[in-house]
């Protein structure tokens, strides 16, 4: 059966934070889980992914 999280009654935000903590401990990355993220977290994740893509593209460039 599923994991039981102790949260205050009706506190959805806290429940989502606890679920995200649990998933990250299991090695499920933020990009792969489909649960609510704060807008600032989304912006940060997208910025990190963009920087990673740019870095990969720079490594692929062939110096001639």
Swiss-Prot record:
This is Small ribosomal subunit protein bS21. InterPro entries: Ribosomal_bS21. NCBIfam families: S21p (TIGR00030). Belongs to the bacterial ribosomal protein bS21 family. The keyword Hydrolase does not apply. Pfam families: Ribosomal_S21. One of its GO terms (cellular component) is ribonucleoprotein complex. The keyword Cell membrane does not apply. GO terms for molecular function: structural constituent of ribosome. Keywords: Ribonucleoprotein, Ribosomal protein. One of its GO terms (biological process) is translation.
